[in-house]
């Protein structure tokens, strides 16, 4: 079964736009779970422009499905994850000023760094996923560094899906097969939506988890949050 983890960063962005606590991030997280989401994902950044570090502590107290924290493993983020001990940490090499994640790790160049970080998180009992491009060598590097899972960066797939979905999925099938052969779990995320999700799942049937935020929240503006989550779950179960 492929789990749907809802990324609630966009909810925090809306909240922070006006100050105060509307929408209530914690209530939205609980409602996502109540509506069928099988996980909650957040991606705090150093400037706290959407998710605040305090949000992570507050969410840890109430999330009853899988809690996944994404981010660049530096300084305050490392301390945050070690203190909270989420079910999963996803290591993402995003720059401080990046609008959103735009590339996976070079797991060969950063092998020693990742090995140390992953070891420390695993000693704390946290499952570790490494965000990678769909390149077999990068998947192999993540396995060598000790990762439990890889998260395949799906923006290139989403961009090419409508023009040539067979070509768009090819390298993901290969990367996923490599991950499976190495004993890694497989997650996927970035620009997945109601149009391209089912094709990804059908071609990688052993996919463990997808984390979806931006498109899901955009769809919720039209369909409502409960209906939207059910629509995404339906795409994963077709």
Curated annotation (Swiss-Prot):
Root EC class: transferase
Catalytic activity, EC: 2.6.99.2
Residues annotated for 3-amino-2-oxopropyl phosphate binding in this entry: 7, 18, 191, 213-214
Organism: Cytophaga hutchinsonii (strain ATCC 33406 / DSM 1761 / CIP 103989 / NBRC 15051 / NCIMB 9469 / D465)
GO molecular function: pyridoxine 5'-phosphate synthase activity
One GO cellular component term noted in the UniProt record for this chain: cytosol
Record keywords: Cytoplasm, Pyridoxine biosynthesis, Transferase
Protein name per Swiss-Prot or TrEMBL: Pyridoxine 5'-phosphate synthase
Function: Catalyzes the complicated ring closure reaction between the two acyclic compounds 1-deoxy-D-xylulose-5-phosphate (DXP) and 3-amino-2-oxopropyl phosphate (1-amino-acetone-3-phosphate or AAP) to form pyridoxine 5'-phosphate (PNP) and inorganic phosphate.
